[in-house]
């Protein structure tokens, strides 16, 4: 999946063929598959021209029905027709039974407490059901694109935990499909609008689907999407709009004690009415009863708005809470992206615009925007993007390191290392009693920080005030499969830590990489000399710092003549260290070390004498 084929400067990487990859929005209500073709990203329709696949699976004695076919039978066979299986992913049977919602399915429990659906074909788990939804989407993609897929990107809610994410991966694995990445749904929506390459700042993703409402507040910083906060309501969605319409129609028609078939018919008509009122001021609702009686009524947009106003208000309240959790205001939100078919409802768009103070982004079909973002990401990950559009790397093109004393670079992860990768090194304090340490993360092949690319800075506080060199700080560099670098510094004795995230590839072109590599070779000899000089200067500063502290504490162990000689030699070290002769600095340090050997021995003897003062030989 090489995105960037690294070659030495002056050499060219071999060209590669277009690789087939797709993005899949595995939704609660509907699922879609999208791909980039001839530079255009679009969802792929089935043979009937339908883009969305209802996320419904029905098990019969002889077959497994998926999508619209399963949906047609859901009223007649609800027990074996599994809808919204995404809600069951990663949840235990105990959690499901403890919830308020009841389900028509017969459940069994697996050995590890997970739910199993009892069907005419035996017991199946949510992962297997999800795989059945993925199966026709994969088949559709391979037929449309004309070949076998090399990978897929599947979207998941930002709040999905590890178990739910792993379940999604396992569903694809059952089909033998390689998952290039699981992508957060709000991030996918932002990518679809190209917000990942635009102005840095805060973005809100308002996602009102069929069964759930999610609001995500993201911050875009140097090409990295950080999820600041998520909120919403897992039991509020467009389905609730449908149920309110259904209740209204039942009341007008004075229908009571209805069976499951009529209930399903009413619900289907409610959805049609809701969709019609998106563009019309009013529409006619119509159902035919089992005895052939035809019932009709006119439903106006004003009536519908009144029915759903309280629910829309609840979503805005969730937005307000989530913004507060994120620590941002509506004025700071640059864009609001609308996701989910229910955001087509005019009242929803009006209320969102009123709350955020600006029109939301709606130019991309809200049902398809997540799948489109996933497809864009899949195209990048599989290696089809030209180098000028570089976003993600499968190897690290330039070394990553940390600045040490003297402006030196300590490389932690070397260039051309395959990602994902994690590397750790230990560092220590320079001064006695040092309680904080500033970290400067850099990128490049040169020996000095001044010649490398600065990536990020952060500070670790709360280091125990120990002698210089006594504290142990473990610095871990971790680069994930997206090329996102996380640097964590931890003081080992206390566990106190600090971290930062940055995308090393952000704003870095292939030309710049080649230039930096050429410079590292061109100036290699000079850089080594400059590094040796800086190292000796740092050592001189360390020795002088340590000796000043020792003299301040135990200077009375020296007579005036001895003190004068040491002071003179220290002054010489300081003077030579200000120059540019590394060998001369080394010799000056060695002379000072030799001259202070006796002083060091006296300090040791004095420390032992003080430690054992007042103790008898038997106590030692």
UniProtKB/Swiss-Prot annotation:
| Source superkingdom | Bacteria
Q: Which residues cross the membrane?
A: none
Q: Which UniProt keywords apply?
A: ATP-binding, Chaperone, Nucleotide-binding
Asked if the record carries the keyword Nucleotide-binding, the reply is yes
Which chain positions lie within coiled-coil regions?
A: none
Cite a single GO BP annotation.
iron-sulfur cluster assembly
Alphabetized GO MF terms: ATP binding; ATP hydrolysis activity; ATP-dependent protein folding chaperone; unfolded protein binding
**Pfam family example for this protein?**
HSP70
Q: Which Gene3D superfamilies match?
A: 1.20.1270.10, 3.30.420.40, Actin, Chain A, domain 4, Substrate Binding Domain Of DNAk, Chain A, domain 1
- Does Transport appear among the keywords? no
Described by its record, this protein's role is as follows: Chaperone involved in the maturation of iron-sulfur cluster-containing proteins. Has a low intrinsic ATPase activity which is markedly stimulated by HscB.
Tell me which family the UniProt entry assigns to this protein: Belongs to the heat shock protein 70 family.
Q: What is this protein called?
A: Chaperone protein HscA homolog
Organism (species) = Shewanella baltica (strain OS185)
């Amino acid at each position: 999946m090489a995105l960037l084929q690294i070659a030495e400067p002056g050499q060219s990487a071999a060209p590669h063929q277009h690789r087939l990859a797709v993005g899949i929005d595995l939704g609660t209500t509907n699922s879609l598959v999208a791909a980039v073709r001839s530079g255009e990203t679009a969802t792929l329709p089935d043979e009937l021209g339908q883009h969305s696949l209802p996320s419904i699976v029905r098990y019969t004695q002889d077959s497994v029905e998926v999508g619209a076919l399963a949906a047609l039978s859901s009223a007649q066979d609800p027990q074996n027709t599994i809808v919204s299986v995404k809600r069951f992913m990663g949840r235990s049977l105990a959690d499901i039974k403890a919830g308020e919602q009841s389900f028509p399915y017969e459940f069994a429990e697996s050995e590890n407490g997970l739910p199993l659906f009892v069907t005419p074909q035996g017991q199946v788990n949510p992962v297997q059901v999800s795989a059945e939804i993925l199966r026709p989407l994969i088949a559709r993609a391979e037929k449309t694109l004309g070949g076998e897929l090399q990978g897929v990107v599947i979207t998941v809610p930002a709040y999905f935990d590890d178990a739910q994410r792993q379940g999604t991966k396992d569903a694809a694995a059952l089909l033998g499909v390689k998952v290039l990445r699981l992508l957060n749904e709000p991030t996918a929506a932002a990518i679809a609008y190209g917000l990942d390459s635009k102005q840095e700042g805060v973005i809100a993703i308002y996602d009102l689907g069929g069964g759930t409402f999610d609001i995500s507040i993201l911050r875009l910083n140097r090409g990295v999407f950080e999820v600041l906060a998520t909120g919403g309501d897992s039991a509020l969605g467009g389905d609730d709009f449908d149920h309110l319409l259904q209740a209204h129609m039942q009341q007008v028609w004075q229908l009571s004690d209805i069976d499951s078939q009529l209930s399903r018919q009413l619900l289907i008509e409610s959805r049609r009415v809701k969709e019609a009122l998106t563009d019309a001021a009013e529409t006619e609702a119509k159902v035919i009863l089992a005895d052939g009686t035809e019932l009709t009524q006119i439903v106006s947009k004003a009536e519908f708005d009144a029915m759903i106003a309280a629910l829309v208000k609840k979503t805005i309240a969730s937005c307000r809470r989530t913004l507060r959790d994120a620590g941002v205001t509506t004025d700071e939100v640059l864009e609001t992206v609308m996701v989910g078919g229910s955001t087509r409802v005019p009242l929803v768009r009006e209320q969102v615009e009123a709350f955020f103070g600006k029109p939301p982004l709606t130019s991309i079909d809200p049902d398809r925007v997540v799948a489109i973002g996933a497809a864009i990401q899949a195209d990048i990950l599989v290696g089809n993007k030209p180098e000028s559009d570089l976003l993600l790397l499968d190897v690290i093109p330039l070394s990553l390191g940390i600045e040490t004393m003297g402006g030196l670079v300590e490389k932690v992860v070397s260039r051309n290392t395959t990602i994902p990768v994690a590397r750790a090194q230990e560092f220590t304090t320079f001064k006695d009693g040092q309680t904080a340490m500033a970290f400067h993360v850099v990128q490049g092949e040169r020996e000095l920080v001044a010649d490398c690319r600065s990536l990020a800075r952060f500070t670790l506080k709360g280091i125990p005030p120990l002698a210089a060199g006594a504290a142990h700080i473990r610095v871990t560099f971790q680069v994930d499969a997206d090329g996102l670098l996380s640097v964590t510094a931890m003081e080992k004795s206390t566990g106190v830590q600090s971290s930062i995230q940055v995308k090393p590839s952000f704003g870095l072109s292939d030309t710049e990489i080649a230039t930096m590599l050429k410079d590292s070779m061109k100036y290699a000899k000079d850089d080594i000399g400059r590094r040796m000089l800086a190292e000796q200067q740092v050592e001189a500063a360390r020795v002088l710092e340590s000796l000043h502290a020792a003299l301040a504490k135990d200077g009375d162990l020296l007579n005036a003549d001895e003190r004068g000689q040491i002071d003179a030699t220290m002054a010489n070290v300081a003077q030579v260290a200000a120059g540019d002769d590394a060998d001369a600095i080394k010799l000056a340090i060695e002379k000072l070390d030799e001259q202070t050997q006796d002083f060091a021995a006296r300090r040791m003897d004095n420390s032992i004498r003080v430690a054992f003062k007042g103790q008898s030989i038997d106590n030692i």
